[in-house]
From Swiss-Prot:
It comes from Bacillus pumilus (strain SAFR-032). This is tRNA uridine 5-carboxymethylaminomethyl modification enzyme MnmG. FAD binds at residues 14-19, 126, 181, 370. Its cofactor is FAD. It is found in: Cytoplasm. PANTHER family: GLUCOSE INHIBITED DIVISION PROTEIN A, PROTEIN MTO1 HOMOLOG, MITOCHONDRIAL. NAD-binding protein involved in the addition of a carboxymethylaminomethyl (cmnm) group at the wobble position (U34) of certain tRNAs, forming tRNA-cmnm(5)s(2)U34. The gene is mnmG. The lineage of its organism: Bacteria, Bacillati, Bacillota, Bacilli, Bacillales.
Amino acid sequence: MGYEAGNYDVIVVGAGHAGVEAALASARQGAKTLVLTINLDMVAFMPCNPSVGGPAKGIVVREIDALGGEMARNIDKTHIQMRMLNTGKGPAVRALRAQADKFQYQHEMKKTMENEPNLTMLQGMVDHLIVKDDECKGVVTQTGANYRAKSVVLTTGTFLKGRIILGDLSYSSGPNNQQPSIKLSDHLADLGFDLVRFKTGTPPRVNSHSIDYSKTEIQPGDDVPRAFSYETVEYITDQLPCWLTYTSLETHQIIDENLHRSPMYSGMIKGTGPRYCPSIEDKVVRFNDKPRHQIFLEPEGRNTQEVYVQGLSTSLPEDVQQRMLSTIPGLENVQMMRAGYAIEYDAIVPTQLWPTLETKKISGLYTAGQINGTSGYEEAAGQGIMAGINAGRKALGKEEVILSRSDAYIGVLIDDLVTKGTNEPYRLLTSRAEYRLLLRHDNADLRLTELGYHIGLISQERFQAFQQKKEAIEAEKKRLYSVIIKPTAETQEFIRSLGGSELKDGIRASDLMKRPEMNYESVVRLAPAETPLPSDVCEQVEIQIKYEGYIEKSLQQVEKLKKMENKKIPDRIDYDAIKGIATEAKQKLKEVRPLSVAQASRISGVNPADISILLVYLEQGRIAKIAE
């Protein structure tokens, strides 16, 4: 027999990386928010790699921070190492990556949530949704507690019908041997949602005391203090190194000899795995010409001896894993503390979502994270903050927010999911973004902080500091556009010392900065500012001036896109009434129900000819609609 347990504006189901961002975003907007999670000891748990950031993903973390989210602040307080990647490349692909103390990361995030006004945390498993007239009204837990809400966000990770597979052993489980969620998955199917079966995996963990580090290569963090959050002022300087080693031909031989025992190749695993994070057995089979593969040894925290063996994700039997490890330089006598495993789980087909992450089928129900078919903590957190923002705004009677592909990598991620769908765990890559020169690590605040402030997630104090930074950037750019550097003997000597060609005439400081050998620091040696500027202001000035032409070209492309985005497609349009559109295109348009012509043009199977016919039809104004 059920009972009424409470009323809230928003309920978030799950407290992983999507759930914590969703809950905090909702509560910080003023919505009374409840988080229900299977185990309160596992808030923001990292079941796989103990790291945050990397190419594209690191930019997402910055975007979450610019909007007012928590992931960046939390990793800045709890990392053991920080590195800027791709420093030898252009600003569009630079990205920050941090090794996390995974246990401290959990502890700090749970503390943040416990201290958040408007946020209640409860341990409990949700079995059903309360749905009436295609509207989600709340949830029911396995104990029969009925919690009512105006919006519900599902962030269930890999728990939906989770199944762990290790060799020929298979059992129902969430990650790290936690309870799986069985009934909720069946309930979603009963409600009419299309589900898919995906798979991911994790490598073994080994005892640091048993590693011979003299046979590995040290991978230290950066000497320059770095941070993900724009608010961080205190930097961790006591960093721990990671270590690099490689598989050997003997490792590959053991894998080849035991492929018949691999669940991936025996048919035990039915779910589709991540393309960009293959298992070691997959790598050995697919790249059999490679004599070795990189293995990174990553400490899981400051107060544990467990080391994550990155690059060795596997579901081979335990005895094979131990033999495999002993063939890797430095790991000959290693003690395996936890075996690697694969986990299968249910996810929903994400084309069943609007760009707000609300489901099309049931109003007031939102989904975020791995339930939407993505992989990665950062992708989950990016969806989480947007689902939390929109669930909170819907509950409070406010207009929902959609990030476009030109606004943020989060916008690219969500648009890809809801427009194209995915047939494998989706990973965000820089190559997925058309406007990556605009979506940089360094300018996330310039792109999104104003929006975060208007939503209510950025404080007045932080917003004022942001405005001062913007003004300082514009003032310094204006100065450099007007200052003329004359070809004095001293100037010519300095330019020659940098490998540049001498000036023929006076030149604007901004034009001099565009030379490949020049940067902001070298230009201000010749044209000093009245007072030294903060490093983040200097960085912005340099990038905006140096890449001015390319940035301008990208902005022109964005303007064209916006014109297409502004051509809205009416709700309930009857595509069958439009003559000339190909049958496949009609099927896809009816399935996705795009909100704009631009979104329609990105659907797989919809061709330019179909878009031209759609545009003509919309301009005629006589639009047939299907009955509600």
